[in-house]
Amino acid sequence: MDKLIIEGGSRINGEIRISGSKNSGLPILAATLLASGPMHICNLPHLNDITTMLALLRCMGVGVTIDEKMCVEVDPTSITEFEAPYELVRTMRASILVLGPMLARFGKADVSFPGGCAIGSRPVDIHLRGLEAMGAEIEVDGGYIRAKAPNGLKGARYLMDTVTVGGTENLLMAAVLAEGTTILENAAREPEIVDLAECLIAMGAKIKGVGTDRLEIEGVKTLNGCTYEVMPDRIETGTYLVAAAATGGWVKLRDTRADILEAVLLKLEEAGAEITVGEGTIELAMHGKRPKAVSFKTAPYPAFPTDMQAQFTAMNAIAEGTSSVVETIFENRLIQVHELNRMGANIRLEGNTAIITGVEKLKAAPVMASDLRASASLVIAGMLAEGDTLVDRIYHIDRGYECIEEKLQALGVRIRRVPG
């Protein structure tokens, strides 16, 4: 199992390009199953989760061709299998997203219960109840969701009892080919859902309320193939900005967007960062200053994203002052605190709240990543520590960050990968 070794004392300084969004690319790849012809999806990041989703499409008989720039042609007209097997689904939660498209287009789907990061309970019951409201017949058998809609899906009004990104995406994709009008209430509003909706609209879907918590979808008979470019990764953007702020450095990020990261940028400015936004660029400068502690509570978009909590917690560990971080989305997502404390951080857990008193320096230690974003926070902590930090189980980080060591090396960080 590969590990990362980070030499402490690095200060971020340089310019890099931001990759396409994994959390947008995965549902868009699932949406290709809805098309009546080939789709061309561009700006996909080269990540394990994307590779797994493409492997899942291939095992269903879908034609997949990839060029050297990670522009993928997907031809769903050759599909022969309607099962997402455990062997592929077990490593990636987003594989559940093929359920809605398969059911809408082909009237049947067998999908194994998904895997992914171990960060708490993320039940799929909202997906299933929504599909049942649209006329699907669903049973759970032997770890598989077995769904069918012999008479096709019908439009329905469905109120999601909690805000769920995956549930919104699955039901949105199911609704675009359903007969009649579907209204999804309490829908998630994340930019990745907007990106998916815009891709579906480019394919011929009729969707109103994009970017709001009420989506109205008028079903159509067929969707066409199209060419679509995935949005930039806002969490990768935020991670490199936090790394620069924590180390007192400077960074310029290209091919990204500031409008999808407002809550994060506001907190970075509160920490003392000077931020300059250009056309497709974000620049952050700390001028060698130690960041100030910032308190926040995670919540669904447009509030502070749970996927940035761990990185800010690492920055707060060496910040000037005391902060509180409240995690309201996933119950186990403060798990990296124990590893940060092993590196000399002063963090106290009270339920879903971390009380962080900043220390001047962390000390290197061997640490273990528990999920995707926790692993990113430990890499940032390694930059801030005295000595060499070894981060184990970095397969988590490879699920969400394209070429992380190469990008950090380009920014002046002394980091290397060693085979396990």
From Swiss-Prot:
Positions binding phosphoenolpyruvate in this chain are: 22-23
Query: 2-(S-cysteinyl)pyruvic acid O-phosphothioketal modification sites?
Result: 117
Q: Which family does it belong to?
A: Belongs to the EPSP synthase family. MurA subfamily.
Q: What functional role does this protein have? A: Cell wall formation. Adds enolpyruvyl to UDP-N-acetylglucosamine.
Per the record, what is one GO cellular component? cytoplasm
Q: Does the keyword Transferase apply?
A: yes
> Mostly located where?
cytoplasm
Q: Where in the cell is it found?
A: Cytoplasm
The cross-references to InterPro entries, in alphabetical order and at most eight, read: Enolpyruvate_Tfrase_dom, Enolpyruvate_Tfrase_sf, MurA_subfamily, RNA3'P_cycl/enolpyr_Trfase_a/b, UDP_GlcNAc_COvinyl_MurA
User: According to its UniProt record, which reaction does this protein catalyse?
Assistant: phosphoenolpyruvate + UDP-N-acetyl-alpha-D-glucosamine = UDP-N-acetyl-3-O-(1-carboxyvinyl)-alpha-D-glucosamine + phosphate
User: Which residues are responsible for catalysis?
Assistant: 117 (proton donor)
Key words, A-Z = Cell cycle, Cell division, Cell shape, Cell wall biogenesis/degradation, Cytoplasm, Peptidoglycan synthesis, Pyruvate, Transferase
Q: Name one GO molecular function term.
A: UDP-N-acetylglucosamine 1-carboxyvinyltransferase activity
EC code = 2.5.1.7
Which EC class heads this enzyme's classification? transferase
Binding site residues for UDP-N-acetyl-alpha-D-glucosamine: 93, 307, 329
What name is this protein filed under? UDP-N-acetylglucosamine 1-carboxyvinyltransferase
Task: Give any Pfam family that matches.
Answer: EPSP_synthase
BP GO terms, sorted? cell division; cell wall organization; peptidoglycan biosynthetic process; regulation of cell shape; UDP-N-acetylgalactosamine biosynthetic process
**Known CDD domains for this protein?**
UdpNAET (cd01555)
Under NCBIfam families, the record lists:
murA, PRK09369.1
Pathway(s): Cell wall biogenesis; peptidoglycan biosynthesis
